[in-house]
Amino acid sequence: MQMKKLLPILIGLSLSGFSTLSQAENLMQVYQQARLSNPELRKSAADRDAAFEKINEARSPLLPQLGLGADYTYSNGYRDANGINSNETSASLQLTQTLFDMSKWRGLTLQEKAAGIQDVTYQTDQQTLILNTANAYFKVLNAIDVLSYTQAQKEAIYRQLDQTTQRFNVGLVAITDVQNARAQYDTVLANEVTVRNNLDNAVEELRQVTGNYYPELASLNVEHFKTDKPKAVNALLKEAENRNLSLLQARLSQDLAREQIRQAQDGHLPTLNLTPSTGISDTSYSGSKTNAAQYDDSNMGQNKIGLNFSLPLYQGGMVNSQVKQAQYNFVGASEQLESAHRSVVQTVRSSFNNINASISSINAYKQAVVSAQSSLDAMEAGYSVGTRTIVDVLDATTTLYDAKQQLANARYTYLINQLNIKYALGTLNEQDLLALNSTLGKPIPTSPESVAPETPDQDCAADGYNAHSAAPAVQPTAARANSNNGNPFRH
């Protein structure tokens, strides 16, 4: 009895858990999944860790080097007149400590600088992942909007085709009006194929970044959408000078190249090593004539300490050549820094201009949608009284939905440009994604079939016009008015 009482509770808990798992993902959740599973970011993290671990390798030659050696030798004097056999065992312990070797110290410094560059690279890859995730996410939302508007446009033109066919059947319009409406409907059908494919590709691009498919995503909350103008461009440039990661990486690379010149010049300097050691040796003899003094068994130990000094005097010009190579590399790194600086200035200014252009585009397309709707209403009213043609109505319909698509695209472009300028400044982080995440609203499906279900019956009805267009064209007006078969949309 208790199990029967618990069963509904367990089922309810399992269903509630399933609904949580199936909820629409928002931008922040998608990014967290990408951060954990993106192979490019994980590779970058591994490269950074390897670079820092290599610092320990570069430091190791400066630390004491301790070695243990052992040796055993057996000698058989079968051709020796004395017939002496011997067993010799020896062992040694040797320590080497670098007292002065500037090239090894320089190598440690170089590796520390190289690890710093790799760390900046990892930070850049983190920001790149944030930008790529947002790009892919909003690209899916934009593709969904485009498909939705294309579907709405198709429905609107279908209604116009239906109405025009009815008017043609009763002799109110010419066959050219029906043909124009049908041509526009076919154009939208062809465009629908493209936008469906674009949505599929956008979903696939998001999967490539995160490793997951998302049946639903949180959509943009258009009602609460607002725009903010960026700071003055000079203030942005000053901030980018100090924080842009590409610029920082170029500066570190120049500093590394400068240090490599010093390392090459160290090839002229001497080295000094301390080499203390201790060893023992045990020798025993056997044979018929081992009574001589030189064949007495021995057991000896020895301690040594020494200094090893080396000064390169001439190496065939190798050191001078290495110095010149390092100097040329420094020139190249300096030019790369200048190139990075120019690129940062261009990127910041372009991002600043793009944000302002996006804001202007949003405002312009808002007005364009209002104007296009008013124009369509006027064209439909004029067509109903005969002052406008069906071409005017179709053009106005296309203009309206084009404006709606452009408005949606302008909103997403603005959001991406907001991230682009943060990326150019070098300050892009998860807080920026949280800010964008707050602009999202209700969940929407991501599959084309769910966004805009296909309408085979409607398309078939539109195709049916071709089979019936010839017959009504030769019928008198009264006959067309009384015919039920002249309108393929009434099947």
Curated annotation (Swiss-Prot):
GO terms for biological process, alphabetical: response to antibiotic
Keywords from the named record: Antibiotic resistance, Cell outer membrane, Membrane, Signal, Transmembrane, Transmembrane beta strand, Transport, Virulence
Originating organism: Salmonella enteritidis
Entry-linked InterPro entries: Bacterial_OMF (IPR051906), OMP_efflux (IPR003423), T1SS_OMP_TolC (IPR010130)
Keyword Transport among UniProt keywords: yes
Reported consequences of knocking out the gene: Non-invasive for a number of mammalian cell lines; avirulent by oral infection of BALB/c mice. Increased sensitivity to acridine orange and novibiocin. Decreased resistance to bile salts and SDS.
PANTHER family for this protein: OUTER MEMBRANE PROTEIN TOLC
Topology of this chain in the membrane: Multi-pass membrane protein
Major location (coarse): membrane
Subcellular location: Cell outer membrane
Organism phylogeny: Bacteria, Pseudomonadati, Pseudomonadota, Gammaproteobacteria, Enterobacterales
Subunit structure: Homotrimer. Part of tripartite efflux systems, which are composed of an inner membrane transporter, a periplasmic membrane fusion protein, and an outer membrane component, TolC. The complexes form a large protein conduit and can translocate molecules across both the inner and outer membranes.
One annotated GO molecular function: porin activity
Low complexity bias spans: 467-481
Keyword Manganese: no
Amino acid composition bias (Polar residues), ranges on this chain: 272-287, 482-491
Protein's name according to its UniProt entry: Outer membrane protein TolC
General function of this protein: Outer membrane channel, which is required for the function of several efflux systems. Required for virulence.
A GO CC annotation given for this chain: cell outer membrane
